Every structure is written in structure tokens, then in C-alpha cells.
Amino acid sequence: MNIHEYQGKAILKTFGVAIQEGIVADSPEQAVEAAKELQKTTGTGWWVVKSQIHAGGRGKGKIAGTEQRGVALAKSLDDVKTISKNILGNQLVTLQTGEKGKKVNKVLIAQDVYYPGESETKEYYVSVLLDRSKGRNTIMYSTEGGMDIETVAHDTPHLIFKEEIDPKVGLRDFQCRKIAFNLGLSGDGLKQMTKFIASLYKAYDSIDASMFEINPVLKTSDNKIIAVDSKVTFDGNGLFRHPDFAALRDTSEEDPTEVEAGEFGLNYVKLDGNVGCMVNGAGLAMATMDIIKLSGGDPANFLDVGGTANAARVEQAFRIILKDPKVKAILVNIFGGIVRCDRVAQGIVDAYKNMGTINVPIIIRLQGTNAVEAKKIIDESGLKVYSAIALQEAADLVKKVLS
């Protein structure tokens, strides 16, 4: 689960991390009031208007059809109002959103922490994430923080460093000092960065996050270390321990069909292909998607019905797949280990009866627990479907119906 920048900063602040202060607004008028309030509390004379969407690259991104950046400096209250008006309610297109962009429903009005006229500020990149290949939390950091970090990672990966954390002992003090030293800091700057790294890791570890990215981390001319941005991803498996954080979810930032699927316990990810697939188990789902691709099709989705699939869940899975107008065929590939094939078969029959006419050809492969009973249910239903025993046979049928 992802959250917005302003929400991530609020979490950081509770763990003692210095942040760029800001107030969220969802209208130009609220934005102006937020700017006035920030001027009172922080003394800032300039402000930064920051689009709040679940995507990076906002600083370089533009509002569709305009030259308005997703993050812009406002030097007056009139600027705050104008920029907010240009951004709110419109589609922001960045490298991470694709051509359609994402609608901006909120802006963060933040204090300007770069101090006009100062030349001794420095931006860094710091993130904490789970390196699944190593089975360890890892701190990634670089002296090349800012809007061009993606370019740095691609062109000069040697400028990004990693510090692995031993899960037995956690982050050690010497590791924090090592990171600060490698970032070229000394004196008060080194002390402040050491403290910053320790607090950031504590926040990450305490909330069961899978990633906490700060880009940029700013060192001011008076050696303050400030989180200017934040990007947080939670481990969904740990959210039951943090109901307050689960409430931060913004479903307007997610695909509506994926949200609906989640409500029925379905693991669904929409793709751009023409063959819908319904599978139980993530590994089998990925293999099925490969088979579809090798057969000349393109998977329209990833859909895992899980190990407790029943007729109602299978019917809902069909409804979700068929909402995609690009789907020209559906491949059902179920291995009955925990899930019973007869339940899946009954779900397919019920879906046909309850949904009326289905004009998309369906290829069904059911193997494992109660597969014989499942075949009987399908055969006696009179449904016009293609049945397969081997996976290659299913792939050949996909190729046939697409041609």
C-alpha cells in the first residue's frame, strides 16, 4: 500500500525526523489559507506547491496539455492560488504515470527550505527498503539526490551505495556514521545526518514498511538535515498491526477494478493484453501469463483467486475480467491442491447463468482435487467452452481462438 507525501512526512515527524513543513489543500482557496498559516508558523516568504499523487517524477512532470509543472515555487500568495488552480483537478503526466497521467485531487503547500540566495545547500538521496534477494533491510544512499536520481541510477549506478542491515542486531551506530561520512559530511553535518539515518530506519522498522524513500534529503547552510519529500510503501501483510495506517489508503489513486477485486479477496492486476486469465497461486499465474505470451496473445490481467476459492469468488473473478473490453478470450488454469476443482467449475457455471450471454471464448484447464467431478459439472452444464488437460493443449487452444 502506498500513501501520499504529506502522510509519509507526518509519520516521519512522529519519529523525530526533521521535515519540510506543509499543509495539504484540495482547493485554491484552501491553498492560500495554508500558505498564510505556514508564513505564521515557519516564517517562510516563499512556498512550494506540490501535487499529491502516488507517482514519482512530479517535479519534472507536467499537467496534461500545459507547461505547468507538478511541483512549482510560489513567490506570492497570488502565485500559490494560480499554481494550485492550474494543478488541482487535472491530469499530471510523469515518467511513472504513463501517457494518461494521474488526476491531482490534493496539493501540499510546503515551506521553502532552500533559503533564497543561499549557495551552500546540498541534496542527497536516502532510502530504506527490503532487499528480497538478500533477505535483509538495506539503506541505499547517494550524494546525487534530487529530480535526476533515476538518471543517476541508470547512467552512473556506482554513485549509489548500499548498507545492509543484519536482522539479528538491527542498524548499528557505526553504520549511521559510515553513511554520513560516505556522503561527504563532517562536523555538525555528520552528526545531524547520523541522527537522521537512525530516526529514518526506526520509522521504517516500526511501521512494517517495505520502502521508505526520501529524495531529496537536504542539508542547509546551517547543517540542518531535512526530509523534503517522502515516499512510503507499506507491507500489506503487516497492516493488521497498524489499523491507523491502513486508514491512510487512498483508493482514488488505484485502479477501480483492482480495488473491487480486493474486496472479494482476489489478487488482481490489470494489464494491457487481450487474454484474461484466472489462476490459483501466484507462481502458476505467472507461468500461465508466459504461456499466453508464447501462444501469440498478451495477458490482460494477473488474477489469483487464492487457495480458498469458492463459486461466488470465481463468479466475481469472471465479472472483473469481462469488464475489460480488450479481452478476447479467457484462460482458466486451476491446480486443485487446497482449492477444489468442482467448486471452481460450479463458479464457472454460475457465472454463465447469472451473467447471461458471454461472447468471449473460454478455455478451461482443471487438474487436481476433484478434477473428475469438475469435468462432469462442466460437461453436463452445456456450456460452450474449450476443455484442456495439458498446459500446452490450453496454450494451443488460446492460439486457435485468437486466430
For each feature predicted by the language model, list its residue ranges.
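Short internal beta-strands
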Residues: 359-367
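Conserved catalytic network of the ASCE P-loop NTPase/AAA+ motor domain
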Residues: 355-357
